[in-house]
Amino acid sequence: SLKQVLLWDKVKDRLDQKATDLSLEEQQKLCIARLLPVKPGLLLMDEPCSALDPKGTEAVEELIWELRGKYTILIVTHNMAQARRASEECIFMLMGKVVEHTATEDMFVTPQNQETADYIEGRYG
């Protein structure tokens, strides 16, 4: 699974070290790699890139795109740019209720709900 998440070449000579010695990007990939052997039906990722720099975010998002054909992936994020880049469908929730569920591009180009549009445009949140 380390090879699946493109981590093997970076850590193969450091397998005896602590995970905390890895970069934050590598730690995120390691967390994902630990799940893959059990073949989960769903990968739930809560703010998977919130602690990463832009380069680390790009690497983790690329990994998400590579895994999407093999797994159902649900990403919880408040980062609208990431939601647009990393998903095919979006669900906008407010106060625990689904406000809108549609194709990502449709949500960002022509949201059907004013609350969705307001959030995407940064009027609140």
Across the structure, where does each feature detected by a protein language model lie?
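Conserved ABC ATPase "signature" region
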Residues: 1-13
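Conserved ABC ATPase signature
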Residues: 18-22, 26
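Conserved catalytic motifs of ABC-family nucleotide-binding domains
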Residues: 39
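Catalytic Walker B motif of ABC-type/P-loop ATPase nucleotide-binding domains
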Residues: 43-46
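A short, surface-exposed alpha-helical micro-motif characterized by mixed small hydrophobic
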Residues: 83-85
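ABC ATPase "signature
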Residues: 101-102
